[in-house]
Design a protein with these regions (language model features):
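A generic structural motif
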Residues: 31-32, 194-198
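A structured phosphate/pyrophosphate-recognition subdomain
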Residues: 187-194
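N-terminal catalytic or cofactor-binding beta/alpha core of small enzyme domains
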Residues: 2-165, 175-184, 205-206, 212-220
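A short acidic/glycine-rich loop-to-helix N-cap element
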Residues: 198-205
Length: 221
């Protein structure tokens, strides 16, 4: 970053020192199959209200969407990119969430693979045809550093396997179509436990803190 760019970034910073040019796009998944109430849909739909209630600095810098658990997730991603606030933002962080019934921790996913497996629809295929099935893309965020900053809030681990269902699908699409194509976009995926493991308020607070932590780190760059 040259001196002119750094000066311009400082001029648009918020009074609290955070970067006003970083917009967060938070996505969760809708109900599907045996999951009638998806934890991530509730978090996505309730996050703006939570940020308002807690007077978070991010309240005016977030867009949210609950998306279908299907290949339509790719269309939803493209739709989000056409959001006027996303278009005008200087930097955008896509934070995708998925539900993991078996985990008792928050799982920060480091990477996604070029493979989709949907047993219900008898579907197995590569996501991007100019890459191999075993190819993977990694987030540009330092997941180990994020884990260290988040582990005091709730048990947090770094995962290197987002499985091959639609969590992996949306993450790979996001990394391939957005983060790889433009420095404006960065992507991260978070697997969350059920509300039975970590209640809704706890999860709201965790996700909000994760975004604020990312915001802090990006402000240092």
């Amino acid at each position: 970053m040259n001196d002119t760019e750094h000066l311009r970034k400082k001029q648009v910073a918020n009074e609290d020192g955070s970067d006003a040019n970083v917009l967060f796009v938070l996505t969760g998944f809708k109900a599907f199959q045996t999951v009638q109430h998806n934890t991530t849909e509730a978090i996505a739909n309730g996050m703006k209200q939570h940020l308002t209630k807690t007077q978070s600095r991010l309240v005016s810098r977030i867009e949210t969407m609950a998306i279908d658990v299907s290949k339509k997730a790719r269309d939803a991603l493209n739709e989000l990119c056409q959001n006027p606030n996303v278009i005008k933002a200087e930097r955008v962080v896509f934070l995708h969430m998925g539900l993991d019934h078996d985990t008792r921790s928050f799982k920060i996913e480091n990477q996604a693979y070029n493979w989709l497996c949907d047993p219900e629809r008898q579907l197995e295929e590569v996501i991007v045809h100019d890459m191999e099935q075993t190819d993977m893309l990694e987030t540009s965020f330092d997941t180990e550093a994020l884990k260290e900053k988040m582990k005091d809030s709730f048990d947090t681990i770094v995962s290197h396997d987002a499985q091959r269902y639609y969590c992996n699908f949306i993450y790979f699409c996001s990394l391939y179509e957005l983060a790889r194509e433009s420095d404006k976009y960065r992507s991260l995926f978070l697997h969350v436990p059920t509300f039975g493991t970590a209640e809704e308020t706890c999860q709201m607070e965790y996700v909000a803190k994760l975004m604020e932590t990312i915001d802090d780190e990006m402000n240092k760059e």
